[in-house]
């Protein structure tokens, strides 16, 4: 920043910087680390010769239909190829309710690294769309009459655990160690701590209550 006073101050509109600071402060205060796994839905749409959207998806709107999923195999395999080269441990994928709507997931991790991967994933999809002459659409609802795209965000608080490099079968890493780093081990404090195996533990219940209280934010 170029201010005369405190030019090295945090930019308050920096979303990533805010997330990093809050996560570090929380861990320092409570000793827990926030783990996050996201489930990004998006649509692969067709376009006209002039590049404008046709308003149609590449596949038909059949949820969890293997044929619709396979029709996009060349596309999502290219996404996997690029993602793996950039440190993504891809773990699952499926076709959702809307036309051309896929959800491709990677391993959960530290909240900041997952946020970085989520942002990078959108860029990967955009590049793959260019190569296949289609549109990678992350709009929530690009047209009416179909299910919208969302992004489930699975949160948990962990104690312990260590950062470990996952080479993802690369003989030598094609990028920095940090890009291929994931938290391994530790204890999920949301797990049941009573005889009820379906009821989250005390910390989990408090976290759920806190999230519900502040949903409006």
How should each PLM-predicted stretch be described?
Residues 1-217:
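Glycine-rich, acidic/polar active-site loops that bind/position phosphate-bearing ligands
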